[in-house]
Every structure is written in C-alpha cells, then in structure tokens.
Amino acid sequence: MARYRHSRSRSRSRYRRRRRRRSRYRSRRRRYRGSRRRRSRRRGRRRGYSRRRYSRRRRRRY
C-alpha cells in the first residue's frame, strides 16, 4: 500500500506543475476527503457508524 501511495503522489506533483492554480485547490480537497475515509475505516468499529452518517450529510453539501 505504501508503495502505491508514493507513486501516486509523484504523478500528482507532475500534473500540478502543468496546471497550478486550479489543480492545487482540487487536489487538496480530494486529499482531505480520502484521509477522512481511511480514518473512519480504521477506527470504524467504535463510533464509525455515527461518523459515517455525518460524513454523508457533509458530502451532499459539497
């Protein structure tokens, strides 16, 4: 998993150089969302359910 993540970040940096203004904001948002999903999966058993519901509401607003 770590290897896959690393390669992905590398390709993203290349893409960022091409289109700086727009891609920067977009990539940042995507990263935040992804990290949140991963966290919920790890902790998920204790209070993951309530968190999932909350994230769903937020996603709709996005």
Swiss-Prot record:
UniProt-recorded Gene Ontology molecular function terms: DNA binding
Compartments, as annotated in UniProt: Nucleus; Chromosome
UniProtKB keywords: Chromosome, Developmental protein, Differentiation, DNA condensation, DNA-binding, Nucleosome core, Nucleus, Spermatogenesis
Summary of the function given for this chain in its UniProt record: Protamines substitute for histones in the chromatin of sperm during the haploid phase of spermatogenesis. They compact sperm DNA into a highly condensed, stable and inactive complex.
Domain of life: Eukaryota
The keyword Nucleus appears for this protein: yes
Reported tissue expression: Testis.
Primary residence: nucleus
Annotated protein name in UniProt: Sperm protamine P1
PROSITE patterns for the chain: PROTAMINE_P1
Family: Belongs to the protamine P1 family.
Organism: Bettongia penicillata (Brush-tailed bettong)
GO terms (BP aspect): chromosome condensation; sperm DNA condensation
Region (Disordered): 1-62
Gene Ontology, cellular component aspect: nucleosome; nucleus
